[in-house]
Amino acid sequence: MIPAEHPTSFSLHCNMASIATKTSSAVESSDPYFQALFADRIGGIAYGKSNEIYKFEKIKRAKRKALADYPHRQLLDFGIGENDSMADAKVREALAREADRPENRGYMDNGPADFKQAVARFMHRQFAVELDATTQINHCIGSKTALSMLPACFINPGDITMMTVPGYPVAGTHTRYYGGAVYRLPLLQENGFYPDFRKVTADVWEKTKMLVLNYPNSPTGQVATRDFYTQVIELAKEHQFVVVQDAAHILLTFRDEPLSFLQVPGAMDVGVEVHSMSKGFDMIGWRIGWVCGNAKIVQAFSDVKDNCDSGQFGAIQRAAIQGLDDPGIPTRIRTKYRRRLEKLVSALRQCGFQCNVPGGSYFLYTAAPKGVKGGLSFANAEEASQYFITEHSMVIVPWDDAGSCLRFSVTYEAADEAAEDALMAETVRRLQGLQLQF
């Protein structure tokens, strides 16, 4: 504690140290005075000066070029990563009603109780998982915010978060913000798109605080099994880390019934599951989800959250209850995207791709071609993607994180099944003409 009788000397000492730090690196004359103040975690003095262009910005630029060069050619967009339909009418009508209720005007903080109770009902009905609505559930403003906050509960400088790659990087980004490190677990086809924990060394296990999983996996489409989750639980207990399972795509499971991590014995002792209403309920922009599982971890998340946001708008939470209580909504969405994936797989197989309907998610992840017959060769998936976009007006997302693969999304806009069929026919026409080499 700082002695109250010496505030001036303490302040001067801190200020002088701060000034020395701020002026230790010169800034350019054209820079604003605060260029030297940016935190190292976002680039420090070099913030905003990088010429690096990230993947999705490259895709946006390539799309603009394709539209400019071929204005009369239809752009086939398989790159969109969000649902193409609005939320169910029942949910939208509930939002309109709830927005007019005075009790929804204020801060929701870590409530309200009725949303948590609806989540408890949903988890019991869908997964046979019993949760205490008061202690084992809390809402989040979309799963992204939850994944950004959970590292604050556990990560100190030098700690490790294990993450699957390819995957959603948010928890890893925030791990680094707190001075931690990310250990990448490649998801390779030869391992069935599961991490190979046998390759993790003892020194990594010693420093690991969190393991972040994502099943059904985006973008590979693999789904978890009970045996896999059992292995994870045993490792968590042996090496003493917590498990965060990102279940954003869990309702888009196509092979068997959706499997929650919390259904597996022991899961509740070691971790939490993060759910989202975006994918499975067509509520992408509504930003509503929840964290559930171990009560102590949920409490830690709630404490961090309480210092980061004031809760999602009550009308959104109470409208979401209508979706949670209607099992027909995710069933209809799942049926639609499975149908589209089956059509896409059929189309791509006609063009040389070796692919199958994934276990889950609305993404199809498949090996990128190495080139076209008698023509170009591609060094990686990004080169293939840029070629498809700029030369053939087909937007496909590249993934070079663990092998060279392409990710097709079936969230394209199509008014009906006839429109879906027409789009698939055009896809086959364009790709077959290229004579792709694999």
Predicted features and spans:
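N-terminal small-domain helix-loop-helix segment of the aminotransferase-like
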Residues: 27-141, 149, 323-325, 343, ...
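PLP-dependent enzyme catalytic core of the Aspartate aminotransferase-like
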Residues: 17-26, 121, 129, 377, ...
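Conserved core segment of the aminotransferase class I/II
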Residues: 22-24, 33-38, 42, 118, ...
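Conserved core of the PLP fold type I
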Residues: 100-234, 251-252, 258-264, 272
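Conserved glycine-rich beta-strand-loop-beta hairpin in the small C-terminal domain of fold type I
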Residues: 321, 337-345, 355-371, 400-404
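Helix C-cap/helix->beta junction micro-motif
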Residues: 66, 70, 178, 238-239, ...
